[in-house]
Design a protein with these regions (language model features):
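Phosphate/diphosphate-binding loops
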Residues: 349-370, 386-388, 405, 416-419
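Short coil/turn connectors at secondary-structure junctions
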Residues: 21, 26-31, 62-68, 96-99, ...
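Long, structured ligand/cofactor-binding scaffold of large enzymes
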Residues: 39-147
Length: 421
């Protein structure tokens, strides 16, 4: 790792901010008013925003309904009358203001990537993992209800320009090692606060060797290192992905060759091993073999970090012809309906069901720890979810380990934490 004083306005994320702020350049530490390209809110907090809209602002005009996206994914379908009321409020508001609403279609960030995100856009979402969109070369960042409400009625928001930490990725991941292992390893290296209010930029030939699903994994977990967002330099793979979905791949910003970053890390991908984050800190990352033989009660494959078709293929390959341990509940939640249908077409769902796994509907599911698959006192879960703090997936006296889709699946078969090799 090298540490240097950062030179201004050569770095990709600042070019995105400058575009949104309608200025020629921006500098780290400056505060700018920006035009938001897109706003996303899910059922976790949208009802609170709607209450503020009615009670505090007295029904102002929405700036641009076409920039707004509402997605129900955290508690879908509703698990109690309170959630049902919040969902009804969300539906009614979306209908009244002609806002695009997705219900039961998948996890919010997957829906956004499939249908809305374009390179170079400045996107805000009322969810901390909005940083996912950096995989397509966008600037995605999470905000709270108050900031969301302001942006909804004005079309604008503000940003304190961050410094940037660059992660140069070299080579390719070895067989049996995945982007999930890479990002958990990075978080273990820098710490959960190691990139506080920084941009995590992933670059180098190693980054370009990753497919879109793998890049989504990296950027999605950037916030778990404290980052403002994560971003991968857009390339031909991004252009192909975006244009194949009928969107334009414009504003393909790249950092200048002579850009200087606050820090630069060089990571050899062929040195990454299967890892696990132990309870109750995501940066307590160890070689998966160090926690081998830890008995588990539940395994989960899904969330906005995993649950895409690539992860489901990995799981199906491991599960084919095998059975989930009688002592384990293995829950699988495809990230979206599109992913679910593709998994059906490829025969993956058949493999899951025949193995004894339970295939859930497309939502946040176990990761959210609110409506499906919650774990009880003293129970142990291994998960592809995003967090493992106390009580994240159920009882505060339960234990959550985080691993890759391969490690989670192999563990579900063995009844204890193990790797797929």
């Amino acid at each position: 790792v090298s540490s240097r004083r950062q030179r201004q306005m050569c770095i990709r994320d600042r070019k995105i901010i400058a575009r949104a702020a309608k200025v020629d350049q921006v500098k780290a530490g400056e505060i700018h008013t920006i035009e938001v390209d897109r706003l996303m809110s899910n059922d976790g907090t949208t009802h609170l925003t709607i209450d503020m809209y009615h009670n505090q602002l007295k029904h102002p005009k929405i700036a641009d309904k076409d920039k707004l996206v509402f997605i129900m994914d955290h508690n879908v379908p509703a698990e109690n009358p309170k959630t049902a009321a919040a969902h009804r409020k969300m539906r009614n508001f979306a209908k009244e203001h002609e806002i695009k609403l997705y219900e039961g279609k998948g996890v919010c960030h997957q829906i956004m990537v499939e249908n809305h995100v374009c390179p170079g856009e400045f996107i805000m979402g009322a969810d901390s993992h909005t940083c996912t969109y950096g995989a397509l070369g966008a600037f995605g960042t999470g905000i709270g209800c108050t900031d969301f409400l302001y942006a909804m009625v004005t079309g604008q928001s503000w940003v304190l320009v961050p410094d940037t930490i660059r992660f140069n990725l070299h080579g390719k991941l070895r067989e049996g090692v995945y982007a999930r292992d890479l990002m958990l390893s990075i978080i273990g290296m820098v710490g959960a606060n190691g990139c506080n209010y920084k941009i995590m930029e992933f670059a180098g030939e190693g980054a370009h060797n990753l497919d879109i699903d793998e890049r989504l994994v990296l950027c999605n977990l950037a916030v778990e290192a404290g980052a403002k967002t994560g971003i991968v330099e857009p390339d031909e793979k991004v252009v192909e992905y975006v244009e194949s979905r009928g969107r334009k791949a414009e504003n393909l910003f790249k950092s200048d060759d002579d850009a200087v970053f606050e820090k630069v890390y060089d990571i050899n991908l062929d040195e990454i091993k299967p890892v696990v984050a132990r309870p109750h800190q995501i940066d307590d990352v160890v070689d998966a073999k160090e926690v081998a033989d830890v008995k588990i009660d539940e395994a989960f494959l899904g969330s906005c970090n995993n649950g895409r078709i690539e992860e489901l293929r990995v799981a199906a390959e491991i599960l084919k012809g095998k059975k989930v341990s009688d002592s384990v509940r293995f829950l699988i939640a495809p990230a979206s309906n599109e992913v679910y249908i593709q998994a059906l077409d490829e025969g993956l769902i058949d493999i899951f069901m025949e193995s004894g796994a339970m295939v859930m509907n497309c939502n946040c599911s176990v990761c959210w720890g609110s409506c499906q698959g919650v774990i009880g006192k003293d129970e142990v879960l291994i998960s592809t979810g995003t967090r493992n703090f106390k009580g994240r997936a159920g009882h505060p006296d339960s234990y959550v380990y985080l691993g890759s889709a391969a490690t989670v699946t192999a563990s579900a078969i063995a009844g204890k934490i193990t790797t797929a090799d």
